[in-house]
Regions:
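Membrane-embedded alpha-helical bundles that constitute the cytochrome b-like, heme-associated redox core
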Residues: 1-117
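Alpha-helical transmembrane segments of multi-pass membrane proteins
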Residues: 104-807
Length: 807
C-alpha cells in the first residue's frame, strides 16, 4: 500500500512549518533554503536510484533482492517531494534567478526586549510549566497510539530532547529576539502538535492498529517537531533576555524554568489520577498559556484585559465541562462511535459501538468484545483442566466479566482477581453480589501482591500483555515465577501467555520465548507449551497433560471452542513437542537484573517487517547518535553527564517498580525530586563548591554511580515501602544536583546567550542518547548493575574528552 496522498500532505505540512519558522525569525531564509534544497536533493537521488534498479530488473531480468522495498521507497519519496518541490520552486524563483550572483543577506538582528526580573522569572516559569505539561500529556497519547514499548518510550523522550536541542541551537544562531513574538509562537505551537497527532493518525493508521517501529519513530518525531523546536528556541532566548536585562546567570534561568516543570509534574500527577482526562487538561493549559501571552505582551487596555480574562474563564469552563476527549477519541478511532472515555494513571479506557456491537478499547486497542469464545476459553481451560477440583483461583488481569463464567464451570469456591487499574474493573459492569462464589477483587500491583501476600492458590493465571517494556517484563522473570510458586499449593498450576506463536517463528521470536521458557523451567519441574491463538506456558511441579479435549470430557466441561469440535489432542501434542524442540535451552533466563526478554521482544518487533529494520536503525543513528559529533569539546562533559542522569532516571524508576510496585504517584514525586536537584544545582551559588574544579566534581559524580551499582542488590531486597521510597528518593538528589551544577559552571560566563544555547542543546542531546541506550539496549543486554557502571563510564569519558581546551 502506498500512502501517496498521506505522504504528500505530511511533507507539505512540514515544509509549511519550516517556512513559518523562517517568517517568524526562528531561522534565516538561507537556512530554510539550504535545508529544503538538501532534502530535495537527497530524495531526488533516492527516487532516481530506485527507478534505475527497477529499470535494470525489467530490462535485464535481474533478480535484485528487496525490489519491492525499493519500489515502495521510490513511490513514497517521489510522491512526498513532488508537491514540496513545486512549493519550493514557487517561493524561491528569485533565488534560482540570482543563483550565480553574490547576495548579502540582511542580519535581521533585533535588540533584546527589556523585562523586569519579576516578569522574566514569571515568563521562565510559564515556559517550564507548559513545556513539562505538554510533554507528559503528549507522551501519554503517543504511547497509547504506538503501543508503549520500551524503545518507543525512549524514542519519544529522545525525540523530545533532540528537537528541543535543535531549537536551542537555532536560537544561538538567530537574530530574532522579540520576546512578544517568541511567546506567541510558543503558546500556539502545542496546538500545532495536537493537530499533527490527529492528522497523522488518520492518514497512516487504522482503528486499533499498533504501528511498526519505523512508523512510530517517524510519527513521534513529526508530532513533537513544531512544539519542541519552538520550546527549545524560546527557553534559550529567554536566558539571553534575562542575562542582558536582569543580569540573571543562565543557571538561575535554568533553575526557574525547572521549578515550573516540577510544579507541572506534581500537578499533573494529581489531575491525571482520574480527576480529568488528557485533552481536557491539554486544551486548558494551551488556553492559559495563550491568555498569559496576550495579557502580558499584546493587550494594554484595562477593559480589554478584563475581557480577555472573562473570555478565558468561559472557554476553560467549556473545555472542563463539555468533555472534549470523546470528540478526540472519535477522531483517533475512525469508524467507531465513541460513547464515553476515561483516562486513568495507567491508560485510557474508551467505550464504543460498531454496527450496533459494543466494545471496550484500552489504550487504543480492543480489550473486550462479544463472541470472544476462543480467547476466553483458552485463557482459562488450558490451566484449570489440569486440576480435578480447583477451589481457589487467582486471575491476574484480563476481563473478569468474560473469564469468570469459564472459571465457574469448575467447583471453585474462591476467585481472587488482581487488576491494577480500577477503571478496568468498573468497565466490567459486574454485579459482585450476583456471583455464586466468593469473589475478592484487589486493585494492587500483582508483582508486589505475590511477593508479600500469604494466600495459597490451586491455580494462578497471568493474562497480562507481553514483556514489551521493563515494567511488564517483571511478570516474566524468575523472581516473579518463584513468588508464584510460593503461593501455589503443592500440585498447583501456573499459566502465562507471553505472546503469539507464529507458524514459522524467526530467530528473534525463538530467543524471546526461550528466555521465558528457561526461566519457568528453572522454577517448576514441568513446563508444557500449548500453541493456540497465543503461546501458553503451563507450569507445575505435578504432571501436565496436553490432551486438552480428553480432559474436557473427563471433567465434564462444556465449551464452544476448547473441545473436540474445534481441537484435536494429537495436533496439540505434536505442536507442543515442536515448540519445545525449537526453543533454545542455553538462552539466558529472564530476570529482574537482566530483563533480556524485553530486549528480545523489541528485536522481534523490529524483525516483523524486514524492509523497515535497516531504515529504523539508520534513523536512530542519525537522530540520536550522530548529534554527539556536533557537540563542542568544552560541552562533552555536559553531554555525558546529562546522558548518565537520563539513564539513571530510567534505572531508578525500574528499581521503584521492582521494590514497591507500579505506584504512579510515587513516580511523579521521584521525577520531581530529580528536577528539584537540577534546579538547586543550576540556580544556587554554593560557595564551597566554587573552590573545586569541574573535573573533581565530575569524579565525585562517577564515584557515586559506582557506589549505587555496588549496592543495587541491597536496594532490590528492601521490602518496606516507606524505606524503599525514601532510599530511592534520596538517591536521585546528588546526581541531579551535580549535573545541574555542571551546567551552571559551564555557562556562568555567558554574556549573550550563545554559550548557553550550545550547552543546553548538548544537555538535551545527551539526555536523548541516555534514554535510548540505557532503557532500550543496556539494561536488557548487560543488566541493571553493569548499566549503572556504564553511567560512571560515561562520566569518565566526559572528563577525558571534555575537560581539556580546544586545540
Amino acid at each position: 500500500m502506498y500512502h501517496v496522498i498521506g505522504t504528500s500532505i505530511v511533507v507539505s505540512v512540514l515544509y509549511l512549518i519550516s517556512f513559518i519558522f523562517y517568517r517568524t525569525g526562528l531561522h534565516s531564509l538561507a537556512s530554510h533554503r539550504r535545508l529544503w534544497n538538501s532534502i530535495l536533493a537527497i530524495t531526488f537521488i533516492i527516487t532516481a536510484l530506485a527507478g534505475l534498479f527497477m529499470a535494470l530488473q525489467i530490462n535485464f531480468k535481474w533478480d535484485i533482492p528487496g525490489i519491492k522495498t525499493i519500489l515502495k521507497w521510490h513511490v513514497e519519496t517521489g510522491a512526498g517531494m513532488a508537491i514540496t518541490g513545486i512549493f519550493h520552486l514557487i517561493w524561491h524563483l528569485s533565488y534560482f534567478r540570482q543563483i550565480f550572483k553574490r547576495v548579502t543577506a540582511p542580519s535581521g538582528i533585533t535588540e533584546f526586549s527589556k523585562m523586569s526580573p519579576y516578569d522574566i522569572s514569571i515568563n521562565l516559569f510559564i515556559i517550564g510549566f507548559t513545556s513539562m505539561s505538554v510533554q507528559i500529556l503528549l507522551m501519554r497519547e503517543i504511547m497509547n497510539i504506538s503501543g508503549g514499548f520500551e524503545l518507543t518510550t525512549g524514542i519519544f523522550l529522545g525525540s523530545w530532547l533532540i528537537t528541543s536541542g535543535i531549537g536551542a541551537y537555532a536560537a544561538g544562531r538567530s537574530g530574532m529576539n522579540d520576546v512578544r513574538r517568541i511567546n506567541l509562537m510558543f503558546s500556539v505551537s502545542p496546538l500545532v502538535s495536537v493537530v499533527l497527532l490527529i492528522l497523522l493518525s488518520r492518514l497512516f493508521l487504522e482503528t486499533g492498529e499498533t504501528p511498526s517501529f519505523l512508523v512510530s519513530m517517524i510519527f513521534t518525531f513529526l508530532v513533537l517537531l513544531p512544539f519542541c523546536v519552538i520550546s527549545g528556541f524560546s527557553f534559550v532566548k529567554l536566558i539571553a533576555t534575562a542575562r542582558s536585562g536582569s543580569d540573571f546567570i543562565p543557571g538561575k534561568s535554568f533553575s526557574i524554568e525547572t521549578i515550573g516543570g516540577i510544579v507541572a509534574g506534581i500537578l499533573l500527577s494529581i489531575l491525571t489520577a482520574g480527576l480529568l482526562n488528557t485533552y481536557q487538561i491539554l486544551l486548558t493549559i494551551i488556553l492559559m498559556s495563550l491568555a498569559f501571552t496576550l495579557l502580558n505582551f499584546f493587550v494594554s487596555g484595562r477593559n480589554l484585559k478584563l475581557f480577555i480574562k472573562i473570555l478565558t474563564a468561559i472557554l476553560a469552563a467549556i473545555i472542563l465541562f463539555s468533555g472534549p476527549d470523546t470528540f478526540f477519541r472519535h477522531l483517533l478511532l475512525p469508524g467507531i462511535r465513541v460513547t464515553a472515555t476515561k483516562d486513568t494513571p495507567y491508560g485510557n479506557i474508551t467505550y464504543g459501538e460498531y454496527s450496533g456491537e459494543k466494545s471496550v478499547y484500552y489504550n487504543q486497542r480492543l480489550l473486550k468484545y462479544s463472541d470472544d469464545a476462543a480467547e476466553r476459553e483458552e485463557n482459562i481451560h488450558y490451566a484449570l483442566l489440569q486440576k480435578k477440583n480447583p477451589e481457589k483461583v487467582l486471575l491476574i488481569s484480563g476481563s473478569l466479566k468474560s473469564h469468570l463464567p469459564e472459571i465457574l464451570k469448575y467447583p471453585v469456591k474462591t476467585v481472587y482477581y488482581i487488576e491494577r487499574d480500577p477503571e478496568i474493573v468498573k468497565s466490567e459492569s459486574l454485579q459482585v453480589d450476583s456471583v455464586k462464589v466468593k469473589l475478592i477483587i484487589e486493585n494492587r500491583d500483582a508483582f508486589r501482591y505475590l511477593k508479600v501476600n500469604g494466600e495459597k492458590f490451586d491455580a494462578v493465571i497471568l493474562l497480562l500483555p507481553p514483556p514489551s517494556t521493563l515494567s511488564m517484563n517483571r511478570y516474566y522473570t524468575t523472581e516473579f515465577f518463584k513468588n508464584v510458586k510460593k503461593r501455589l499449593n503443592p500440585d498447583g498450576i501456573f499459566m502465562c501467555s507471553p505472546g503469539i506463536w507464529d507458524n514459522y517463528p524467526n530467530r528473534e521470536s525463538l530467543n524471546f520465548f526461550s528466555s521465558i521458557y528457561n526461566s519457568l523451567t528453572a522454577v517448576f519441574k514441568n513446563v508444557k507449551p500449548v500453541a493456540g491463538n497465543k503461546l501458553y506456558f503451563i507450569s507445575s511441579d505435578s504432571e501436565i497433560s496436553v490432551s486438552i479435549c480428553q480432559l474436557t470430557e473427563e471433567r465434564n466441561i462444556h465449551n464452544i471452542y476448547v473441545s473436540y469440535d474445534f481441537l484435536a489432542d494429537d495436533l496439540i501434542a505434536n505442536k507442543s513437542a515442536q515448540v519445545i524442540s525449537l526453543l533454545d535451552p542455553s538462552a539466558r533466563k529472564n530476570s529482574s537484573l537482566f530483563p533480556i526478554a524485553s530486549f528480545h521482544f523489541q528485536s522481534y518487533n523490529l524483525s516483523r517487517d524486514l524492509s523497515e529494520k535497516i531504515p529504523s536503525i539508520i534513523f536512530m543513528v542519525i537522530v540520536f547518535a550522530l548529534p554527539v559529533l556536533t557537540v563542542r569539546r568544552k560541552n562533552l562533559l555536559m553531554y555525558c553527564s546529562a546522558s548518565a542522569l537520563a539513564g539513571f532516571e530510567i534505572i531508578i524508576l525500574l528499581t521503584l517498580q521492582l521494590t514497591v510496585g507500579n505506584m504512579y504517584q510515587f513516580t511523579g514525586i521521584i521525577l520531581a525530586a530529580l528536577m528539584a536537584g537540577l534546579a538547586v544545582g543550576a540556580g544556587i551559588n554554593i560557595r564551597f563548591l566554587n573552590a573545586l574544579n569541574l573535573k573533581l566534581k565530575a569524579m565525585f559524580l562517577a564515584g557515586y554511580y559506582i557506589i549505587i551499582a555496588l549496592i543495587t542488590s541491597f536496594l532490590l531486597s528492601v521490602n518496606s515501602i516507606p524505606a524503599a521510597i525514601t532510599i530511592i528518593l534520596l538517591s536521585v538528589l546528588f546526581p541531579s544536583f551535580i549535573t545541574g551544577h555542571i551546567f551552571r559552571e559551564i555557562t556562568i560566563t555567558d554574556k549573550d546567550g550563545s554559550r548557553s544555547a550550545v550547552t543546553y542543546s548538548s544537555d538535551l542531546a545527551g539526555s536523548a542518547f541516555g534514554f535510548m541506550v540505557i532503557s532500550g539496549v543496556a539494561i536488557p543486554l548487560i543488566g541493571l548493575k553493569v548499566s549503572i557502571f556504564l553511567l560512571s563510564g560515561l562520566i569518565f569519558a566526559g572528563i577525558l574528552l571534555g575537560t581539556t581546551t580546544d586545540k
